[in-house]
UniProtKB/Swiss-Prot annotation:
Zn(2+) binds at C901, C904, C921, C924. PROSITE patterns: AA_TRNA_LIGASE_I. It comes from Yersinia pestis. A motif ('HIGH' region) lies at residues 58-68. One of its GO terms (cellular component) is cytosol. L-isoleucyl-5'-AMP binds at E561. This is Isoleucine--tRNA ligase. Belongs to the class-I aminoacyl-tRNA synthetase family. IleS type 1 subfamily.
C-alpha cells in the first residue's frame, strides 16, 4: 500500500496550540517596549481625527487590585478600538499623588511634621513615597497589556502640574466663584482636617437618642397661640437629637411651618409636640395619661422664645423644610455650627454660627464648666446627666443608626464650623450652569445622568481648603485684620505658580511674602491651607490635557471610572471646568460597577474572597483577565471567581483554536500571488467571507457603543458556530485533499486569509497579546503591529439576489444539523463509525428539494458523507426520520457503497480504476496526478 501522506496539504504553523500566556506575554511586553510600540502607533495615527480618553488618576498608594484592572483594561479596549476605527487616540496614564493617605503612611515611617521632622522634610518624604508607589503600580498596569505613554505619565505632584492646579484656582477666583466662610464641614478629629464628601463613609453606630425640654420664656403668649388661656405648670417645646454633644451650640429650634402642633397636658406640665408624633413620644417616655389642650401650625409659633436648658440664654423657634415627621418630636434642635441644614436655616434667620469644638474634637475653654476640654463623643453622657439634673430630660434611649465616618480611620466624624474656603454653587450660578452642562454629556449607562443631576442639585458649596502638609497650597494672601484677599491675587498667584513650576510646592512655604508683596507684606499674611486633593484630580482637564502637546489642544472626549465617581472625580471635574471655562470637561462619561465574587459578595480580605490580578496574570495570563473584563456587562456588578475565570480561559481556547486552524491552513499561501478573485471563488468560501463581513459590522457597532460583552458574544458565535461547527469542518476535505495550487484549495485559502485578517483586528483591543502573536504568523507583507491598523476593508459577501445567498446557506446549516443528529444516533448504535461511512437520502418537499439539488454532487461535501441524494418527500419510507426543525424534510441513510479511498477516506465505486494509482478514487487521482478537481459550491 502506497503512502499518500506527502500528497496531502496538511496544516502547518508555528503558532502554538497552547497559549502559555503567563510565560509568553512578558517577552512580548519586552519587545513592545524595546521597539516603542506606543510611539509606532502615535506615528501611524498622526493627523487622524482624535479621540481622547482622559485617565482618571488612581491614588498612588498600595498595590493595584482587581477593580483597578477592570478600569484600566476597559480604557485600553476603548483606546485600541478607537485606533481601529481610524482615530488618533493618545493615552496618558496618570496618578493622584497628594493627600491624606500618603501623609498617614509617611507619618508611620518618619513621624508627624513638626515633631521629628520639619514640614519641608516631610513633603520630600511624601514625594519619594508617592513616586515609589507609582512605579509599583505602573509595572502591574503595563503587565495587563495596557498601551500608553508609561515613560511620561502625568502625576499631580509634577512641578508643572502643581503650578497649573494653582492657575486653575486663580481662574476660578477671577470668575468670582470663591468665598470664605465659617461653615460646618465634615471634620475628622483624627485627621485634624475637613473631609470631602467622597471621603465620608457610613457605618452603623449606637448613639443616645434624647427628647429634651426647652421651656417657654412667656407661658401665656405661647398658650394663647394654642387658644388656651390657662395651663397647669410650665410649657416646654420638646426637641429630639442623637448628638447630645452639640447642645452647647444650639441657637434655635426648627419647626415645619405647615405641620400641626399640639399643646399636650401631662402631669404638672405641658409639652408642645407635632400632632402626628404625640403618641410615639408618650409611649417611649412612659406617659400613659395626657390630654390635648389645643392645636396650631408651626408658622404660628415662629420667633417665640424658649430657654436653653443649661446655657443660660433663650433661643427662637424658626421654620425650616428640613423638619420631617419620620422620627423625633417634630421640633429639631438647631446648631448652625454643627450641621449643613442648621447652617442654611441659621443664615436665613441671622443666627450665630457657634463653634465651641476645637480641631481635636474637644470642647474649647469657656464652653461650659463640666464640658471644657472634654472629647465630644465622651461628653454625650455628661450632657445627658446635665439635662437630667436640670429637669430638662424627658427621655433617653440607645439608637443604632447609620453614621458618617472617616474613610481612612473608620472613626465617627463631626460637622464643625471652621474658617474655610469654598467654591460657591450659587454665588455666580455654578449650580445652574453645571446642571445645564450635564444635559449635553452622554452618560453611559444613561442612569448616570439622573444620579449626578440629583447630586449637583442638592450639593452644598464645595469646601476646597484643607489643613494638611502634603498638598498644593492655595497660594493666597489675606489682609491681617479684614481677612480679605489681596486685590492683586490673580497676579500674585501666577507669580507663585511660576516658582512652583520651577521648584515644586515647597516654593510656597519657602516664599518670603516681601519678595512678591513688597511693602504690602506688613499687612498681608499667607493662607496656610492646602487644596482638597479632589481639586488636584478635578482640574487635570486643564492642568494636564490643555497643556500636553499629544492632545493637540483638544478637550477630553471621555471619562471612564467606577460608579462611585459620580460624587468624586466626575463631580469635581465638572465643577472646576464649569467654574473655569463655562463648559463640561467631557463629552461622554462611562461608569462601571464594582467587582464582587461569584456569589455577588463584595471583595473582602476578611471573607477571603479577593482575587489578585497579579495572581491571575501569573497563572492564566493577561489576555484571560482582559477577556473576562470584556465578557462582563460592566454596567452592573462585575463578578469574578476562579470558576468564572476558568470559563474565560475555555472561551479563549476556542478562539485560539479557530485562529490556529486558519493559520495552519494558510500554509504555503502567498496573498500577493495566490488570492482567487471573489467571482471565481467556490460559493461557500464567499459565504464564509460574507459571514465575517456581517460579524464585523456587528462587532464594530458593539465597539462603537462600548458593548464589549456583545463583541465577545459575536466573536464566540462566529468562531464556534459559523466557523467551527460548519465552515471549518466542511472545508477540511477540500483543504487537505485538493490539488495544492488548484483553484479549489486556493479559493478556500483566500477565504481563510480574509477571515484571519478580520479576526485578528476584532481580537486586538481585547486579547492584545494573542492578536500580536497571530499577526506575526499571518502570511504576506504587513505593518509591524496590528495596533496600527484599522478594521479590515477586504471583506465581501454573497449578493442577496443570488440563488445561493445567505438565506440558502442558513437553511443548509439547519439541514446539516438535522443530518448530524441522525448520524450521531447511528454512531451511538454502532451502525457506522464515521459519517463518511454513510450515504444519505434527503426526502424533501419540492422547493427544498430543488435548493438541495442545486448543489449537485457537492451536497455530500456539505453533509460530510460519502454520498448524498435528494428524493421526493412523498417517497419516504417508514424508516425515514422526520426532521424536528424542517417540516418538509425526512432523512434516511445506508452504509456507503464502494471501497474506502486511503487518501480522502471517502467510499466510492471508482477506487482503483486508474492502474498507476490502483488504491485511489478518481477524485484523488485528479488531485494527485491531474489538473485538480473542480468545485463550484462547496
Amino acid at each position: 500500500m502506497s503512502d499518500y501522506k506527502n500528497t496531502l496539504n496538511l496544516p502547518e504553523t508555528g503558532f502554538p496550540m497552547r497559549g502559555d500566556l503567563a510565560k509568553r506575554e512578558p517577552d512580548m511586553l519586552k519587545r513592545w517596549y524595546e521597539q516603542d510600540l506606543y510611539g509606532i502607533i502615535r506615528a501611524a495615527k498622526k493627523g487622524k481625527k482624535t479621540f481622547i480618553l482622559h485617565d482618571g488618576p488612581p491614588y498612588a498608594n498600595g498595590n493595584i487590585h482587581i477593580g483597578h484592572s477592570v478600569n484600566k483594561i476597559l480604557k485600553d479596549i476603548i483606546v485600541k478600538s478607537k485606533g481601529m476605527a481610524g482615530y488618533d487616540s493618545p493615552y496618558i496614564p496618570g496618578w493622584d499623588c497628594h493627600g491624606l493617605p500618603i501623609e498617614l503612611k509617611v507619618e508611620q515611617l518618619i513621624g508627624k511634621p513638626g515633631e521629628k521632622v520639619s514640614a519641608a522634610e516631610f513633603r520630600t518624604a511624601c514625594r519619594k513615597y508617592a513616586a515609589e508607589q507609582v512605579e509599583g503600580q505602573k509595572k502591574d498596569f503595563i503587565r495587563l497589556g495596557v498601551l500608553g505613554d508609561w515613560d511620561h505619565p502625568y502625576l499631580t505632584m509634577d512641578f508643572k502640574t502643581e503650578a497649573n492646579i494653582i492657575r486653575a484656582l486663580s481662574k476660578i477666583i477671577d470668575n468670582g466663584h470663591l468665598h470664605k466662610g465659617a461653615k460646618p464641614v465634615h471634620w475628622c478629629t483624627d485627621c485634624g482636617s475637613s473631609l470631602a464628601e467622597a471621603e465620608v463613609e457610613y457605618y452603623d453606630k449606637t448613639s443616645q437618642s434624647i427628647d429634651v425640654r426647652f421651656n417657654a420664656v412667656d407661658t401665656a403668649t405661647v398658650a394663647a397661640k394654642f387658644g388656651v388661656s390657662a395651663v397647669n405648670g410650665p410649657i416646654s417645646l420638646v426637641i429630639w437629637t442623637t448628638t447630645p454633644w452639640t447642645l452647647p451650640a444650639n441657637r434655635a429650634i426648627s419647626l415645619n411651618a405647615e405641620y400641626l402642633y399640639q399643646l399636650v397636658q401631662v402631669e404638672g406640665e405641658c409639652l408642645i409636640l407635632a400632632a402626628d408624633l404625640v403618641e410615639s413620644v408618650m409611649k417611649r417616655a412612659g406617659i400613659t395619661q395626657w390630654a390635648v389642650l389645643g392645636s396650631c401650625t408651626g408658622s404660628d409659633l415662629e420667633l417665640l422664645r424658649f430657654t436653653h436648658p443649661f446655657m443660660g440664654f433663650d433661643v427662637p423657634a424658626i421654620l425650616g423644610d428640613h423638619v420631617t415627621l419620620d422620627a423625633g418630636t417634630g421640633a429639631v434642635h438647631t446648631a448652625p455650627g454643627h450641621g449643613p441644614d442648621d447652617f442654611v436655616i441659621g443664615q436665613k434667620y441671622g443666627l450665630e454660627v457657634a463653634n465651641p469644638v476645637g480641631p481635636n474634637g474637644c470642647y474649647l475653654a469657656g464652653t461650659y464648666p463640666t464640658l471644657d476640654g472634654l472629647f465630644v463623643f465622651k461628653a454625650n453622657d455628661v450632657v445627658v446627666e446635665l439635662l437630667r439634673e436640670k429637669g430638662a430630660l424627658l427621655h433617653v434611649e440607645k439608637l443604632l443608626h447609620s453614621y458618617p465616618c472617616c474613610w481612612r480611620h473608620k472613626t465617627p466624624i463631626i460637622f464643625r464650623a471652621t474658617p474655610q474656603w469654598f467654591i460657591s454653587m450659587d454665588q455666580k450660578g455654578l449650580r445652574k450652569q453645571s446642571l445645564q452642562e450635564i444635559k449635553g454629556v452622554q452618560w453611559i449607562p444613561d442612569w448616570g445622568q439622573a444620579r449626578i443631576e440629583t447630586m449637583v442639585a442638592n450639593r452644598p458649596d464645595w469646601c476646597i481648603s484643607r489643613q494638611r502638609t502634603w498638598g498644593v497650597p492655595m497660594s493666597l494672601f489675606v489682609h491681617k485684620e479684614t481677612e480679605q484677599l489681596h486685590p492683586r491675587s490673580i497676579e500674585l498667584m501666577e507669580e507663585v505658580a511660576k516658582r512652583v513650576e520651577q521648584d515644586g510646592i515647597q516654593a510656597w512655604w519657602d516664599l518670603d511674602p516681601a519678595e512678591i508683596l513688597g511693602a504690602d507684606a506688613a499687612d498681608y499674611v499667607k493662607v496656610p491651607d492646602t487644596l482638597d486633593v479632589w481639586f488636584d484630580s478635578g482640574s487635570t482637564h486643564s492642568s494636564v490635557v490643555d497643556v500636553r502637546p499629544e492632545f493637540g489642544g483638544h478637550s477630553p472626549d471621555m471619562y471612564l471610572e467606577g460608579s462611585d465617581q459620580h460624587r468624586g472625580w466626575f463631580m469635581s471635574s465638572l465643577m472646576i471646568a464649569t467654574a473655569m471655562k463655562g463648559k463640561a470637561p467631557y463629552r461622554q462619561v462611562l461608569t462601571h460597577g464594582f467587582t464582587v465574587d461569584g456569589q455577588g459578595r463584595k471583595m473582602s480580605k476578611s471573607i477571603g474572597n479577593t482575587i489578585s490580578p497579579q495572581d491571575v496574570m501569573n497563572k492564566l495570563g493577561g489576555d484571560i483577565l482582559r477577556l473576562w473584563v470584556a465578557s462582563t456587562d460592566y454596567t452592573g456588578e462585575i463578578a469574578v471567581s476562579d470558576e468564572i475565570l476558568k470559563r474565560s480561559a475555555d472561551s479563549y481556547r476556542r478562539i485560539r483554536n479557530t485562529a490556529r486552524f486558519l493559520l495552519a491552513n494558510l500554509n504555503g499561501f502567498d496573498p500577493a500571488q495566490h488570492q482567487v478573485k471573489p467571482e471565481e471563488m467556490v460559493v461557500v468560501d464567499r459565504w464564509a467571507v460574507g459571514r465575517a463581513q456581517a460579524a464585523q459590522a456587528e462587532i464594530m457597532e458593539a465597539y462603537e457603543n462600548y458593548d464589549f460583552h456583545l463583541v465577545v458574544q459575536r466573536l464566540m458565535q462566529f468562531c464556534s458556530v459559523e466557523m467551527g461547527s460548519f465552515y471549518l469542518d466542511i472545508i477540511k476535505d477540500r483543504q487537505y485533499t485538493a490539488k495544492g495550487d488548484g483553484i479549489a484549495r486556493r479559493s478556500c485559502q483566500t477565504a481563510l486569509f480574509h477571515i484571519a485578517e478580520a479576526l485578528v483586528r476584532w481580537m486586538a483591543p481585547i486579547m492584545s497579546f494573542t492578536a500580536d502573536e497571530i499577526w506575526n504568523h499571518l502570511p504576506g507583507e504587513r505593518q509591524q503591529y496590528v495596533f496600527t491598523e484599522e478594521w479590515y476593508d477586504g471583506l465581501f459577501g454573497l449578493a442577496g439576489n443570488e440563488s445561493m445567498n445567505d438565506t440558502f446557506w442558513a437553511e443548509l446549516l439547519k439541514v446539516r444539523g438535522e443530518v448530524n443528529k441522525v448520524l450521531e444516533q447511528a454512531r451511538s448504535d454502532k451502525r457506522i463509525g464515521g459519517s463518511l461511512e454513510a450515504a444519505v437520502t434527503l426526502y424533501a418537499e419540492p422547493e427544498l428539494a430543488a435548493r438541495l439539488n442545486s448543489l449537485q454532487d457537492e451536497l455530500r461535501f456539505v453533509l460530510l458523507t460519502s454520498a448524498a441524494k435528494v428524493a421526493a418527500y412523498a417517497d419516504a419510507g417508514n424508516d425515514a426520520q422526520q426532521s424536528e426543525l424542517i417540516a418538509g424534510l425526512k432523512i434516511t441513510f445506508n452504509k456507503a457503497d464502494g471501497e474506502k479511498c486511503p487518501r480522502c477516506w471517502h467510499y466510492t465505486q471508482d477506487v482503483g480504476l486508474v492502474a498507476e494509482h490502483a488504491e485511489l478514487c478518481g477524485r484523488c487521482v485528479t488531485n494527485v496526478a491531474g489538473d485538480g478537481e473542480e468545485r463550484k459550491f462547496a
